[in-house]
Amino acid sequence: AVGMLVSVIATYFVKVKNEKESPQIALNRGVYSAAIGFALLSLVLIKYVIGDMTFVSGGIEVGSWGLWLAILVGIGAGAAIGHYTEMKCSAKYQDVQDLAKSATDGPASLFTKMLALGMATAFVPALILAAATIAAYQFGGLYGIPIAAVGMLGTLNMQLAIDAYGPISDNAGGIAEMAGLGENVREKTDKLDAVGNTTAAIGKGFAIGSAALTAVIMLVNYAGKMQMDVSLLSPWACAGLLVGASVTFKFSALAIDSVGTAGAQMKDFIVKQFEDDGPVKDAFEALNKAKAEKRDPTPEELVIIEAGKRAADYKGAIAIST
């Protein structure tokens, strides 16, 4: 209920101050406003309901301040995952720019880079969730972990509203194009569409992160109900499960990215030999001339082609691939 209230109030902070300001900044302002409001009202609510009462959860004595700090952990984890997702999906950051640049090398290079980037992004959110699990346990015991999930989901209404921004802006761009509106209108809708794609990715990252934290809660609760004397009750074990599962994706991403990087370097190295003045370029031009005229190379052209083959730097290409 508190989350719904602050999300409604936060919508009034989503305003673009001028044409130069990115719509993403305005949307982020709404999210952060909702998070701050939720944190403050949660403290008031916890103090009113819990007061000075304390209880023991998971061997840790928990009070109202501990529960509030657990909520702050959840809010911080959600904000961190959202910001990291924006860094990996927004066109103003280096990763997306490098991905677009790799498209100039061909679809294979683009796909390799894209797959590596997508797999690598699983690692940092897992670290954030692992840290949030441990911190929430230190502040609120086992009960602090679900409370942290509540903190992460406290601004869910605002996140879902921003997630809906993507298809709305996309449809606006389609209508503008079909209506034959001016180029300036289409430029604005394209800008909004780009931000919409980012907000959609942020919403998915936020949802997946909160679902992962909820899964940790269910695992701990199951172990407790079944009275299982195993380390699953330890938040360190749960954090280790999250990090360990993501390490596979991280190392796979590094391996795939190395293949793409080596391929791009190989392409640049070979193209440079054909573009620089010398025997290789002369041989390439002689061969293309014969193909264009649909004939076999003349004896003079064969001499030039053989000279180009001998002058080619094969060792440099082998060094790149090995």
For each predicted feature, which ranges?
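Hydrophobic packing and interface segments
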Residues: 1-322
